[in-house]
Structure formats: C-alpha cells, structure tokens
Amino acid sequence: MEDIATKLRRIREIFGYSQDYVANRMGISQPAYWQKENGKRMPSEERFGQIAELYNLSVEDLKWEELNTVLIKVHKMQIEILEKKVPLGV
C-alpha cells in the first residue's frame, strides 16, 4: 500500500492540489483522503476511478505502474498542455 500511497501524494503535489481539494472532488473528507495518501487505507475501486479521472490517468497506472513511470506520464501531459497554451515558434 505504501507505493500507491506515495504515488497519490506525489501526483497530487505535482498538480499543486491540496488534500482538501482532492477530497472534495471525491466527495470525502480530508482526513479520509489523508488515510489513503498515507497508506492507512486502500482506496476502493470507485475511489481509484475518481482519482484516476481527476489526474487523467488509468486505474492501472495508479495501481500497477512504477512511480517514476507514472510521474513521467504526468509531466508529459503537463508539457502537452503548456505547448497548447503557448505554441512553440511564435
């Protein structure tokens, strides 16, 4: 559970979201989300789906991919978003 918890925390930090923001988006309390992010409780399938949707990732990314692989995907998504906002060569 620690690896998933670490992924949840690191991804949230990269997006710049607070635990309270993520918890509100999921319809749970901040302490309930804190438990998931700190390895005290495993997210349910429904919660995994909500978290994956929030970050535009798959549930499989959250559950099974190595942390570095997921972080690279997140960074690539952020670069794509920035490139759309600021076209290169302009």
Segments and roles (model prediction):
Residues G16-Q35:
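Short alpha-helical DNA-recognition segment
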Residues M1-I14:
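A short, Lys/Arg-rich alpha-helix, primarily the initiator
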Residues G27, S44-D61:
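DNA major-groove recognition helix of helix-turn-helix/homeodomain DNA-binding modules
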Residues E13, N24, E53:
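Alpha-helical residues within the helix-turn-helix
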Residues E13, G27, N38-K40, L67:
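Residue-level detection of the helix-turn-helix DNA-binding "recognition helix"
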Residues T6, G16-Y17, P43-E46:
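Residue-level signal for the short linker/turn that defines the boundary of a DNA-recognition helix
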